[in-house]
Each structure stands twice: as structure tokens, then as C-alpha cells.
């Protein structure tokens, strides 16, 4: 039932508006006296009708995070060039829901760290990581990010990003190809799908 006023709303008194609303509420209450049946009762062991999906809230949240990763840029060296190539039109990063790289960590949930990290830069990497909202994921790109790479023995180079921030996926290579980075993003998607959001 809808509110059908015989005269303009501005000319009605409050009592007339209350009567109309009361009628709508009463008709709604009389039509909704029993709870909706449990899906297991009306399915009777059959497949749900087209357009009906039975799932959990956790799976819906993971699905939405899976297709809306917002990466923050943290390009430190030559691997960042391959990260930029992946964002170009040839590899079409938009099909993964990642068409916009965020400049602010407060709007991102994936950090792609590409290149050689020095100890002088490490506190800033940690600070940007701490500013990202939960849940968040880190992707270490390249040999330098994985283990320090060619510069591992240098006094100023961090031998692996996992000494500064927790890393979810490593992409080997010097530099890794855009296809390898896309494979790593798909690995992060699989990790997101297995994430337990609700504590039991």
C-alpha cells in the first residue's frame, strides 16, 4: 500500500498524515505475520531456482574484496617499471578490479613493494603499511624484495621486505615480467577467498 493523498502534502494536517501512515503500517503488519521459511525447507534437496544464491556473509565479503583490490604504489627501483607496464592497456589490470592505483595508503588494501629497499627507507615502508586499513595484503616484487637480490651484501640494503612488514606473496625475477605479477595478484585473490572474517 502506498501513501495516496487527496490534496498536496503541504495542505494536510499532521493528524491526516498520521492516519495515512498508520494505514500503511497496519496493512504491512497484517501481510507479514509469519517468518520467511528456512531455505532448507523450501528447497527440499533440489537446486535453488535461477537467480537465487545460497551463501554465507563471509563468502560475499571475500568475493567483494576479491574483485575490488586497491593497490598503493611503492616503487623503489627497476621492478616498478614492470609494475607500471602491468597497469597499462596491454595487460588490462581493470579486469581484476584494480584499475586505479591509490596514492594514499588509507584508501588501499594491497601494497605492491617493487625494488630495492634500503634501511633508511624501511621506517617509511612500515609507516605506510601501518596506515593501511585492515584487511591488508603485501606483495613483494622482484629478487631485491624477496631476498635483497644483487645488493644483499650491502650494508644499506634490507635483505627481504619480510624483515620490515609481513609479506603475503613473493614474485621472483629481476625484474619479474608483468605476467608474473598478475599471477601473484591471482594468488592474493585465492588467499582472500580463504580469509576467515567472522571469528567463531
Curated annotation (Swiss-Prot):
Q: Where in the cell is it found?
A: Cell membrane
**GO cellular component assignments:** plasma membrane; respiratory chain complex I
The name on file for this protein is: NADH-quinone oxidoreductase subunit B
Q: Tell me which family the UniProt entry assigns to this protein.
A: Belongs to the complex I 20 kDa subunit family.
Query: Can you state the subunit structure given in the record?
Result: NDH-1 is composed of 14 different subunits. Subunits NuoB, C, D, E, F, and G constitute the peripheral sector of the complex.
Q: Which UniProt keywords apply?
A: 4Fe-4S, Cell membrane, Iron, Iron-sulfur, Membrane, Metal-binding, NAD, Quinone, Translocase, Transport, Ubiquinone
Cofactor annotation remark:
Binds 1 [4Fe-4S] cluster.
Summarize the protein's role. Answer: NDH-1 shuttles electrons from NADH, via FMN and iron-sulfur (Fe-S) centers, to quinones in the respiratory chain. The immediate electron acceptor for the enzyme in this species is believed to be ubiquinone. Couples the redox reaction to proton translocation (for every two electrons transferred, four hydrogen ions are translocated across the cytoplasmic membrane), and thus conserves the redox energy in a proton gradient.
Cited Pfam families: Oxidored_q6
* Amino acids binding [4Fe-4S] cluster: 78-79, 144, 174
Write down the top EC class of this protein.
translocase
**InterPro entries named in the record:** NADH_UbQ_OxRdtase-like_20kDa, NADH_UQ_OxRdtase_20Kd_su
Q: Which molecular-function annotations from GO does this UniProt entry contain?
A: 4 iron, 4 sulfur cluster binding; iron ion binding; NADH dehydrogenase (ubiquinone) activity; NADH:ubiquinone reductase (non-electrogenic) activity; quinone binding
What biological-process GO terms show up in the record? aerobic respiration; electron transport coupled proton transport
EC number, as in UniProt: 7.1.1.-
- Tell me which domain of life the UniProt entry assigns to the organism this sequence originates from: Bacteria
- Signal peptide location in the record? none
Q: Which gene encodes it?
A: nuoB
* Reactions this protein catalyses: a quinone + NADH + 5 H(+)(in) = a quinol + NAD(+) + 4 H(+)(out)
- Give the cofactors, semicolon-separated: [4Fe-4S] cluster
User: What is this entry's stated membrane topology?
Assistant: Peripheral membrane protein
The family database entries (NCBIfam families) matched by this protein are listed as: nuoB_fam, PRK06411.1
Amino acid at each position: 500500500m502506498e501513501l495516496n493523498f487527496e490534496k498536496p502534502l503541504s495542505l494536510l494536517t499532521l493528524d491526516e498524515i498520521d492516519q495515512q501512515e498508520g494505514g500503511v503500517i497496519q496493512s504491512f503488519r497484517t501481510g507479514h505475520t509469519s517468518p520467511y521459511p528456512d531455505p532448507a525447507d523450501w528447497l527440499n534437496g533440489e537446486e535453488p531456482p535461477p537467480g537465487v544464491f545460497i551463501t554465507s556473509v563471509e563468502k560475499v565479503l571475500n568475493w567483494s574484496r576479491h574483485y575490488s583490490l586497491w593497490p598503493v604504489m611503492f616503487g623503489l627501483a627497476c621492478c616498478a617499471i614492470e609494475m607500471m607496464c602491468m597497469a597499462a592497456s596491454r595487460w588490462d589490470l581493470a579486469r581484476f578490479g584494480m584499475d586505479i592505483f591509490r596514492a594514499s595508503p588509507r584508501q588501499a588494501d594491497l601494497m605492491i613493494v617493487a625494488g630495492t629497499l634500503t634501511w633508511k627507507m624501511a621506517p617509511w615502508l612500515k609507516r605506510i603499511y601501518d596506515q593501511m586499513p585492515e584487511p591488508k595484503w603485501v606483495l613483494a616484487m622482484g629478487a631485491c624484495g624477496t631476498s635483497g637480490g644483487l645488493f644483499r651484501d650491502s650494508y644499506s640494503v634490507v635483505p627481504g621486505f619480510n624483515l620490515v612488514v609481513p609479506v603475503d606473496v613473493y614474485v621472483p625475477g629481476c625484474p619479474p615480467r608483468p605476467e608474473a605479477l598478475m599471477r601473484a595478484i591471482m594468488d592474493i585473490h585465492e588467499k582472500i577467498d580463504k580469509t576467515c572474517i567472522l571469528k567463531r
